[in-house]
């Protein structure tokens, strides 16, 4: 049962500094959580009446203790949340005349394995108010008991990652405004229990965005003769690596127009700061976010948004949360800098004077990203790392790769102006990370003769995988240029985690063909009718199960055309191909999410599909 494992309070003592005041339960699975006091009361906490923070701690089953740092040398890449806990923390400062330091500072935190812990802010807010009126271990214990009358796991749906992506990347209501306005009952026929939490159309038109997949939970907090009811709005779906109320669009908008990150180095690469940030996170460099004026909650949002960013904004890459620290202080620097790579947030300006502590510094206040000059010094850098960052650096553009990066940044700028900017930005970031993974797959297969990124390609029933180039020379040139970047990523935790998850994947079609590769060929290449026919026939042949359709739909978001790339086969010159595509669309139409994608097709495509079905039925009836 998923619950609130610990409820904690901390105070700032004028003589001892941050001190853990109460902990409930006192003797839990691992009772020593005193190290949390420093994190619960961050730097400059006295400057604000209240603040929030969110961070992770790790439980070691071997030593039976909690720690801020996971054992990086002994990471188990099997996906599991059992050893990582989320800590949501509220901070309060009181001005009291006549007291030392002019007042007092308190904090209350909940520690849980519940990934949507940020949604419990109203609950923690109310718990603090109750505790503040009668601060004692007894009050804290009663609040902890009230919290755990609920099973938090019941608040979100157990969906596959592909199903979660379908719901997160598609704004279904915007595609069905006409249906909702004229015939609201239509939606009742096409939405089943898996998406019951979507707001139903009523007298007014409802706009559904990425953040609308929520459920409401009402808690009753009872302690010391007080009884308070609190309602929390909790996301119904969970995307790995996307923790908190992150805004990737805000992160990108903050740094996209910044100056060159290489101003303090001898590298003259003209590359956007966003590309530098993504590359640094991909290859597990030490990335530090700094603010001297913003709140701890703002700092945490930037760090967590960066974690989501490098995941492809959709959990495509996982594992970075193990080395992510939304807030860290000077007392933990020694352990932090020993890590081969990290993503962290700090509020102490002392970090700016120690370029040996970080590789990339993201200054939130000045909206700049800076690469450490120490990264290129003979004293601190091996020859392999130096070659990674000079003319063969993953940060240094060549013509083709630079064009891809420039198009990526151009698209981001355009999407940042859109009404549904967060969804569009996430989709574009996913495509960018996806293209990197697919090129890395082609690199491994060509130069290493096998690819852990795709262990099935040699046995594919329908050949073709990785990235698609116009010719072999272009392919070899780009892969050779990107080789240092690929090799650096192959040492990163996100690479190892991705390989493990793909090896354990149960979706049947993944073992038969590379759907992404062939969808791109249909979208972007000048295919002959024969080549197109082979792809359409292979899709119909291998996309059979519900998981297969889920995977297909997760690669066909509505705002990039949806099923139109499939429907194009309805107009093929071959009757066999037209029938095959019609059968595939029939399969998709009966799928729980596929029916929504099908209805988003234009009227001509739907009419053509209906006509082909009817003709096929007539021929069958005539025999």
Curated annotation (Swiss-Prot):
Domain of life: Eukaryota
UniProt entry keywords in alphabetical sequence: Cytoplasm, Nucleus
Domain cDENN stretches: 248-386
Ranges where the uDENN domain occurs: 5-204
Protein's UniProt keywords contain Nucleus: yes
Subcellular compartments: Cytoplasm, Cell cortex; Nucleus
Species assigned in the record: Schizosaccharomyces pombe (strain 972 / ATCC 24843)
Protein name stated in the entry: AFI1-like protein C776.06c
Signal peptide: none
One GO-annotated biological process of the protein: actin cortical patch localization
Purpose of the protein: Involved in polarity establishment.
Upper taxonomic lineage: Eukaryota, Fungi, Dikarya, Ascomycota, Taphrinomycotina
Location of the dDENN domain: 388-476
Gene Ontology CC terms, in alphabetical order: cell cortex; cytosol; nucleus; plasma membrane
Family to which the UniProt record says this protein belongs: Belongs to the AFI1/mesA family.
């Amino acid at each position: 049962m998923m619950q609130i494992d610990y409820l904690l309070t901390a105070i700032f003592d004028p003589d001892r500094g941050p001190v853990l005041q109460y902990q409930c339960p006192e003797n839990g699975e691992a009772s020593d959580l005193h190290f949390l006091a420093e994190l619960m009361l961050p730097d400059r906490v006295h400057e604000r009446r209240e603040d929030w923070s969110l961070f992770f701690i790790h439980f070691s089953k071997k030593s039976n203790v909690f720690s801020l740092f996971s054992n990086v040398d002994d990471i188990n890449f099997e996906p599991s949340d059992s050893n990582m806990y989320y800590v949501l923390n509220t901070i309060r400062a009181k001005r009291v005349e006549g007291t030392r330091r002019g007042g007092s500072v308190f904090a209350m935190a909940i520690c849980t394995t519940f990934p949507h812990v940020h949604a419990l802010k109203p609950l923690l807010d109310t718990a603090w108010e109750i505790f503040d009126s009668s601060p004692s271990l007894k009050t804290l214990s009663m609040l902890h008991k009230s919290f755990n009358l609920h099973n938090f796991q019941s608040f979100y749906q157990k969906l596959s990652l592909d199903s979660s992506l379908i719901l997160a990347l598609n704004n279904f209501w915007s595609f069905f405004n006409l249906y909702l306005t004229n015939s609201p009952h239509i939606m009742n026929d096409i939405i089943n229990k898996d998406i019951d939490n979507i707001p139903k159309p009523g007298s007014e038109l409802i706009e559904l965005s990425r953040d609308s997949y929520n459920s409401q939970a009402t808690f009753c907090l009872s302690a010391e003769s007080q009884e308070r009811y609190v309602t929390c709005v909790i996301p119904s779906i969970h995307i790995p690596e996307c923790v908190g109320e992150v805004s990737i669009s805000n992160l990108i908008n903050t740094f996209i127009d910044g100056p060159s990150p290489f101003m303090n180095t001898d590298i003259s690469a003209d590359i956007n700061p966003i590309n530098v940030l993504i590359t640094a996170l991909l290859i597990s460099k030490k990335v530090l976010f700094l603010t001297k004026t913003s709140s701890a909650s703002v700092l945490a949002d930037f760090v967590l948004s960066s974690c989501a960013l490098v995941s492809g904004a959709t959990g495509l890459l996982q594992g970075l949360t193990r080395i992510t620290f939304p807030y860290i202080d000077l007392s933990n620097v020694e352990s932090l800098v020993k890590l081969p790579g990290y993503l962290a947030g700090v509020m102490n300006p002392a970090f700016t004077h120690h370029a040996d502590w970080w590789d990339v510094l993201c200054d939130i206040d000045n909206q700049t990203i800076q690469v450490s000059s120490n990264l290129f010094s003979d004293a601190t850098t091996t020859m392999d790392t130096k070659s990674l960052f000079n003319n063969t650096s993953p940060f240094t553009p060549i013509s083709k790769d630079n064009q891809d990066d420039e198009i990526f940044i151009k698209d981001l700028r355009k999407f940042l102006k859109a009404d549904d900017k967060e969804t569009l930005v996430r989709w574009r970031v996913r495509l960018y990370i996806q293209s990197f993974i697919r090129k890395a797959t082609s690199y491994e297969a060509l130069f290493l003769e096998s690819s852990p990124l795709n262990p099935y390609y040699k046995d594919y029933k329908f050949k073709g995988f990785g990235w698609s180039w116009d010719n072999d020379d272009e392919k070899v040139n780009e892969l050779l240029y990107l080789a240092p970047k690929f090799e650096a990523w192959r040492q990163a935790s996100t690479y190892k985690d991705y390989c493990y998850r793909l090896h354990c994947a149960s979706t049947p079609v993944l073992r038969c063909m590379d759907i992404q590769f062939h969808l791109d060929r249909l979208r972007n290449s000048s295919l002959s009718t024969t080549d197109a026919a082979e792809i359409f026939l292979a899709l119909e042949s291998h996309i059979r199960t519900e998981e297969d359709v889920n995977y297909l739909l997760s690669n066909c978001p509505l705002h990039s055309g949806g099923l139109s790339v499939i429907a194009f086969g309805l107009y093929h010159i071959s009757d066999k191909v037209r029938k095959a595509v019609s059968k595939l669309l029939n399969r998709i139409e009966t799928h729980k999410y596929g029916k929504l994608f099908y209805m988003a097709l234009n009227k001509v495509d739907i009419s053509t599909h209906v006509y082909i079905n009817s003709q096929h039925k007539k021929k069958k009836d005539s025999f």
